[in-house]
Curated annotation (Swiss-Prot):
This protein's encoding gene: nuoK
Protein name per the record: NADH-quinone oxidoreductase subunit K
UniProt entry keywords in alphabetical sequence: Cell inner membrane, Cell membrane, Membrane, NAD, Quinone, Translocase, Transmembrane, Transmembrane helix, Transport, Ubiquinone
Organism of provenance: Agrobacterium fabrum (strain C58 / ATCC 33970)
Reaction equation(s) it catalyzes: a quinone + NADH + 5 H(+)(in) = a quinol + NAD(+) + 4 H(+)(out)
Alphabetical list of InterPro entries matching this protein: NADH_UbQ_OxRdtase_chain4L/K, NUOK/Mnh_C1-like
Length: 102
């Protein structure tokens, strides 16, 4: 059995759907929302690499590396903001986030 483009797209669609459901079903925990965003970005990366390999073009793979870099920076900044917010408020509930000053 050969793993083809449709298999990669199916896995990507499943990951994207899980990420979207994670955002809509769990609106109380910021960490779960950040992890769901990372799942969505991972699904996009799988699509980029799958189509890049299918079309024998390296541009999709290079673009996926840029997306991974942005996702890593987003995760680091998001977690740093959460740590500071938790130290100040004692909670990371989404309801408390809209009370931030700035």
């Amino acid at each position: 059995m050969v793993i083809g483009l449709s298999h990669y797209l199916t896995v990507s669609a499943i990951l994207f759907t899980i990420g979207v459901f994670g955002i809509f079903l769990n609106r109380k925990n910021v960490i779960v929302i950040l992890m769901s965003i990372e799942l969505i970005l991972l699904a996009v990366n799988i699509n980029m690499v799958a189509f890049s390999a299918f079309l024998n073009d390296i541009v999709g793979q290079v673009f996926a590396l840029f997306i991974l870099t942005v996702a890593a920076a987003e995760a680091a900044i998001g977690l740093a903001i959460l740590v500071v917010f938790y130290r100040n408020r004692g909670s990371i509930a989404v309801e408390d986030v809209n009370m931030m000053k700035g």
